[in-house]
Swiss-Prot record:
UniProt organism field: Anaeromyxobacter dehalogenans (strain 2CP-1 / ATCC BAA-258)
Taxonomy of the source species: Bacteria, Pseudomonadati, Myxococcota, Myxococcia, Myxococcales
E.C. designation(s): 1.8.5.-
Pfam families linked: Oxidored_molyb (PF00174)
Keywords recorded for this protein, A-Z: Metal-binding, Molybdenum, Oxidoreductase, Periplasm, Signal
Gene that specifies this protein: msrP
Cofactor stoichiometry and binding remark: Binds 1 Mo-molybdopterin (Mo-MPT) cofactor per subunit.
Protein name, as recorded: Protein-methionine-sulfoxide reductase catalytic subunit MsrP
Cofactor: Mo-molybdopterin
Amino acid sequence: MARWRPDMAEREATPEALYLRRRDFLALGAAGAVGLLLPRGARAGDPTGAALQVARKVDQAGGETPTPWDSVTGYNNFYELGTSKEDPSRNAGSLRARPWTVTIAGEVKRPQTLDVDALVRMFPPEERVYRMRCVEAWSMVIPWVGFPLADLVRRLEPTSRAKYVAFQTLLDRDQLPGQRRPVLPWPYVEALRIDEANHPLALLAVGLYGRVLPGQNGAPLRLVVPWKYGFKGAKSIVRITFLADRPHTTWNDAAPDEYGFYANVNPEVDHPRWSQARERRIGEFFRRKTLPFNGYAAEVAPLYAGLDLRKNY
């Protein structure tokens, strides 16, 4: 597949310096909207963590303003670190992101175990500004740092039997204390069809806002699929498995009427308990219309030609 070429110029992505100058206003907006609590000792808008070198910066969010750092890192769903939105940032210190390896298995010609730092050396990361839409009807705009999942897939040489790719989160009740409670069947597993995994927009993220990925955001390696609801983005990945048959996935198994396997953002298919037609952007007061495929329909809709998206939600 041809490598994705964004039509947005690099200068349209918001520089971190500009973001820092307006952080007070935006942070107050986010806090008022969602009651955001900052991690203890943190100040609004102070990015932390080691800086990452990026090969290029591109905007695939239509020039929308990125959500402030303190909101992106302080308002999270990561049940392995707790079920409230503030738990992940409070508990992230227990997650040890180095050393870290990822096991590649299944229907590939080159199964192997890779160190996450070796992955970064193999595939120089780039910054991509993406919209993120949660199934809970809130959204953000996040400048991720990572590399195309398709680059890794090609290097691994899937066999002709490989139709799906599954991503498994770390299972460690000491590092991820939320796993001590049977909130979900652990470990967390998500999956994509092989053609979705090969789409140029699918990203394996190792950072955000030019910094290494914080624990609460899925350090050191997480999946980002911007046209799908956020729960498809497996965090703290330790295993990637190529499969002939569709695997079981965590939320789809736990509540299939509420969380579909495809989980494509679709304003015409409501969650059983709320509408998906509108969303609240973190930091904004009024709701906005939700876009089909989260605004990426032109790029990804052909993947689902002929598929009934109401039944295959």
